[in-house]
Every structure is written in C-alpha cells, then in structure tokens.
UniProtKB/Swiss-Prot annotation:
Keyword Glycosyltransferase: no
Subcellular location: Nucleus
Species in which this protein is naturally found: Callithrix jacchus
Taxonomy, superkingdom: Eukaryota
Record gene name: ESR2
Name the record gives this protein: Estrogen receptor beta
Gene3D superfamilies assigned: Erythroid Transcription Factor GATA-1, subunit A, Retinoid X Receptor
Amino acid sequence: MDIKNSPSSLNSPSSYNFGQSILPLEHGPIYIPSSYVESHHEYPAMTFYSPAVMNYSIPSSVTNLEEGPGRQITSPNMLWSTPGHLSPLAVHHQLSHLYAEPQKSPWCEARSLEHTLPVSRETLKRKVSGNHCASPVTGPSSKRDAHFCAVCSDYASGYHYGVWSCEGCKAFFKRSIQGHNDYICPATNQCTIDKNRRKSCQACRLRKCYEVGMVKCGSRRERCGYRLVRRQGNAEEQLHCAGKAKRSGGHVPRVRELLLSALSPEQLVLTLLEAEPPHVLISRPSVPFTEASMMMSLTKLADEELVHMISWAKKIPGFVELSLLDQVRLLESCWLEVLMVGLMWRSIDHPGKLIFAPNLILDRDEGKCVEGILEVFDMLLATTSRFRELKLQHKEYLCVKAMVLLNSQYDPLVTATQDAESSQKLAHLLNAVTDALVWVIAKSGFSSQQQSVRLANLLMLLSHIRHASNKGMEHLLSMKCKNVVPVYDLLLEMMNAHVVRGCKSSITGSECSPAEDSKSTEGSQNPQSP
C-alpha cells in the first residue's frame, strides 16, 4: 500500500533553497474515524527577546565525532531540565491498564526507576526492540535474545515480510496477500490485536499487519530499523550482523561508533529525511465537534502517530545502539514534544490553524468546546508563529525534532541509573545531530554572525516546546481522570509512565503512603467512579 505524495497544501516551506538533492519519500496514510470542522483565526506570535550573538564555532569539516585538541563541542547537552508537571489529582486517578498483569510493587517505591514503571511498559520495550539485530529466537527460554511479534507481541519466530513476527501472523499475512483478504470488522475497525485476541478479528489483524510495516517483499536490509547511506556498502552489512558479534565478544560496537562518526552532516540529514513518518489521515464526519468527539479524535490520532514515532526513532543512526532502557526512557520523556514539533511544522504555512492531519484542520475557536484546551492551542499557535517568523526550513526541522528526542533525558533520576557506555553514545549522537543543524544553517547563505543568532533562536524555542508539552500532558491527564475520553494501547502506556515519573519526582526518594497507593489502585479498578 504505497501513497506517493502528501497533499500539496501541506508541502514544506521553501523560503530558502539549499540546493541539496532530496530523496523521494513514500508515505502510507492510515484511516481512522473522527470529526472535522474548519474555520479561520489569526493568532499573533508571542514576544521573544533576541539573544546576544553566540560564540558558536562552526567546524569546517564535520567528519569525526571524536574530540580533538582544537575541536569545540557544539552540542547543548543541558538545554533544559525535566520539570515535574503533573497535578496531584492525576497521580491518584488512573484508569485501569489494558493488560491484566498485577503490579509487583507500589508505584512510588523508592527504588530504581526501572522497577517503578508499570508492568505494561514491556509492550513499549517490545515495540522499540522489535527490529534489533540479535541472535535467532530459539524459544521462550532465551529471553535475553528473544524478539517479539510486531503484530500480536507473541514470541517471534523470525524476520518475516519486513518485520519480526510469529508463525501465526506470518501465515495469516501470507494467506491474506494471496487473495483471502476480503475481511470485514464486525465492530468499529479498532479491535485490539494481541496474543490472546489476534484471531478475534481478521480485518483488524490485517490492518495492524500493514500498520507495523509488513510488506509482500520484506527487505532483510532493514533489519536494524534504519539504513545508513548506500555508499557505505560493506560497512552497512556489518551493522546487520551485530547480534552475532556481540555474543562472541567482537568489536562491532566500536565499528558502529566509527560508522556514525564517518557520517557527514549531509548524510545524516538525508538519513533523517528518509526516516520521516507518513501522514495519518482521519475521516470527516458531518457533525460539529463536541468535547468528547474532539478528544477522541486527538487521542486516536496520537496513538497512531506514536507507532510511527517509534519507527522513526529507530531509523536515526545510532539510536538502536543505545541501551534498551535508554531508548524507552527517551521516548517516554519526549513523545508529546515530538508530536507537537511535527504539528507545528505541518501548521507553519497556515497562520492561525493547527494541522493535526491533512483533513483534520482546527483553529483556536474550535477548541472552545473542550475545557482547558484553549491554553494549549494558544501555546502551539504562538510557537508556530515564531517558527514562521524565522522561516524554518525542512532540514532545520528534521534536526530540531531529532534533538528534542535525544536531549530529553537529562534529569537526576535518569542519569543516576543510566548506563555509562550508553550515556556516552547518546552524547555522541546528540553532537552529530547538532553539527548537522549547524551545517544546515551554514548552507543557507547567512553571515557567520547571522548563523550564530539563528542557531540561538532555534534552540530557545525548544524550551517553549517543552512548556507546551507539559501543559498538553496535564490537560490530557485531566481529561482521562474525568472519563471524558478512554485511552488505550500505547498512548495509555506513555501517559502511565509520565504519572509514575511525576510521582517519583515528587516524593524525592520517600515512599508513597499506603492510603495514597490504595486510592490510586482503587481509581484504576473503577474508572467510571466520580
């Protein structure tokens, strides 16, 4: 299912001409039901003060990430701290998990962050590690090397049709592409497909097969979740065999590090361009939005975009070389920021409007039907206006979005338990993306002073994106606690991770009281109670 181009009305801004060759993109829209209303509203940009000229040196040749005697580090490793943004109400009013697995310890027990997160976090780990290179799966006993089916999360038997999948989903997809695909969902085309319910709805099972990336001729070259530039030839093949070398104690990690260092800024930008996720489409109903229908549309859209965001992250060169825990933490920390950056980019050519999807276009006044969302809309529109004033270019946007992901983990709770080697790799990768942004700005034809000012202006906006994300998360949690909209699947896991992290930060090492913990548990078991 290949969709060649996105709508022309949403093409990237073209105020500058970089003169770079752009690789063709293929996007596959996904259709989910929602509501649609459109009107117009002009929202002025928020006032930003201009910074002093930064003393930011631009290396003439960025081909090695190792620090040299004359090399100035260009990565802003501490752009912001992770604030505690959750209200106490959100911590004690959770909906029940979609997975019937018991909690093995209280949420706020003062132990490592890894053991305080919900059990359902394992699903996110499976999605993140689904395309890693590792040893073949020999059975449930080899859990350290096991892969999981991207469709139903059962143990995968191998890499079939472009993704890791079990024998059941492999055989089902094979039958479907051979002609037996006239399935009809008896419900709303939103059935949950997991190990226990994968046979309940063939239509939704086939839809999920396509969503996770199953194709008729799955390519083994994409086994690691990303592709380096083709000119690297044999070096790329070494990446795809990393699992075997790891078990034999080989030096593949060093080879990978060198390969990342060898990527020029231009090559890295082209790789980010290839990694861009497809647009998610929403059908247009004929009735105006209500609070429930708008929140349902936005949460469904976010849940679909999260799946593509994980695939996008794994295509960033070097991301899958981080520890699995660090990958999960990064995604949990910044998922809403990444989605908001994409929303701002889609909206940059449409003043006063928010382009959530090509056919879901909202203006500020339409948010009046949802309590508390106007403030979030205002922040999104204001930051988008600032990007518009700066005439943000597509390649700059690609680098900024990658920086939001990679720079989202600098807080004391995380760094205290972070693997040292993985932390070094993360800093290495952030340096590479920052150098790529510097290269993109330098290619725009600005003077040296203008380049420094532009870089400073772009980096200052990252804190405003974080602020909008915090406010959006607070609003989403309040809607969930009030039972305005049900939240399922991956979106529920991400929200639960934020609740746990907020609770962990608020107690600063002390345990939550038993009364509070029981109250939270009671709220999860009785989502319909006031």
